[in-house]
Design a protein with these regions (language model features):
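...captures the hydrophobic TM-helix bundle architecture rather than a specific catalytic motif
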Residues: 1-365
Length: 365
């Protein structure tokens, strides 16, 4: 699957071309480039999924974990380094399908919806950057690489929410989203540093020698801090306050960022770290459950009590969007495995909800 690197490189190239040369392009040319690139990315993602899920399984019946690309980026010590690469397992392949499909549909829909808008080329450049960031996040081979793309997602969402930079409401909304998620991401970063110090690695499997020296006692703290970052990105209570105002961006952006992909990042983080939660921090999973369940109950009440003048998209995001929060809360009751979460029935509602709301939000706008 050597072509999987193109899933990241193509949207990055689209961002650079549209960002640097967009002002010399017509709206039609910029839209065609952005949409064609995401169409190619979607095709590559589906090919990756077909090849992965049809490949022979391991002896115990589980899917293999593949790393088509992996290289050392920052070698701190002989035993501790930060790598960059691509990780393919059932969760990451599933998310590639979700992100590439919804992103392609948003690019295609925006071609007509944003017709005649000032900054059309800039809009497509930001969409490509956001898509590349989300794709890089879900195929990260280690927590530090995930954090790098995590922050790129935050920056690109800030740019998209504030796309109408002449509107005071859009400027305020983009700042609010950026600041609130930065507080949450600070907890994520501290958790990563704690994990790397006591686990002896930044991969998703701790170093057994480091754990034998007493590092296991600090893993629950590290995972709890990481969950704060996930709660902020997925707009869980009490870090949900940025999401309604973020609808000040273009309506297709609301479908891409807040309804379909970005808000799933926190749930993906919990799913990716689920084996560690089960083995080293089962008590933290109770906190995840309480926060996710309360958010799933509280957010629809906010939608019902929303002010009458609030945009329909601002109300809609409260409702089916909360299914993923409930899924994060209930994830801990499913059968744990040391090998990982794999692709189970609990992921099916996540896939369906992302696609359904990715369609519903543009229709409401």
């Amino acid at each position: 699957m050597e072509y999987t690197i193109l899933i990241l490189l193509l949207p990055l190239l689209s961002f650079l071309v549209l960002g640097l040369g967009g002002k010399w392009m017509s709206h039609r040319t910029a839209g065609l480039i952005g949409t064609a690139v995401l169409g190619a990315v979607a095709v590559l993602s589906y090919l990756t999924a077909i090849h992965y899920f049809t490949a022979p399984r391991l002896a115990d019946g589980t899917f293999a974990t593949l790393m088509p690309y992996n290289c050392t980026w920052l070698p701190f010590t002989p035993t501790l380094s930060i790598d960059l690469g691509i990780l393919l397992d059932p969760i990451s392949v599933m998310m590639l399908i979700v992100i590439s499909t919804v992103s392609f549909m948003v690019h295609l829909y925006s071609f007509g919806y944003m017709k005649g808008e000032r900054g059309f080329q800039r809009y497509y450049a930001f969409l490509s950057l956001f898509t590349m960031s989300m794709l890089g996040l879900v195929v990260a081979t280690n927590i530090f690489q995930m954090y790098l793309f995590w922050e790129l997602v935050g920056v690109s969402s800030y740019l998209l929410i504030g796309f109408y930079y002449t509107k005071p409401a859009a400027i305020a909304a983009s700042k609010k989203a950026f600041i609130v998620t930065r507080f949450a991401d600070l907890g994520f970063l501290i958790g990563i540093l704690v994990y790397g110090y006591y686990a002896g690695t930044y991969t998703f499997q701790p170093n057994e020698m480091a754990l034998l020296k007493g590092g296991a006692a600090m893993i629950p703290l590290a995972l709890g801090l990481m969950f704060i970052g996930g709660a902020g990105k997925s707009a869980m209570f009490p870090l949900h306050i940025w999401l309604p105002d973020a609808m000040e961006g273009p309506t297709p952006v609301s479908a891409l960022i807040h309804a379909a992909t970005m808000v799933v990042a926190g749930v993906y983080l919990v799913a990716r770290m689920f084996p560690l939660f089960i083995e080293y921090a089962p008590s933290v999973l109770h906190i995840v459950a309480y926060v996710g369940a309360f958010t799933a109950f509280y957010a629809p009440q906010c939608g019902m009590c929303a002010e009458r003048h609030q945009a329909c998209t601002g109300i809609l995001h409260y409702l089916p969007n909360r299914f993923h929060d409930g899924g994060a809360g209930c994830m801990y009751i499913s059968r744990p495995t040391r090998r990982g979460t794999g692709l189970h029935g609990r992921h099916v509602p996540l896939i369906h909800t992302r696609h359904v709301q990715g369609i519903a939000v543009p229709r409401s706008g």
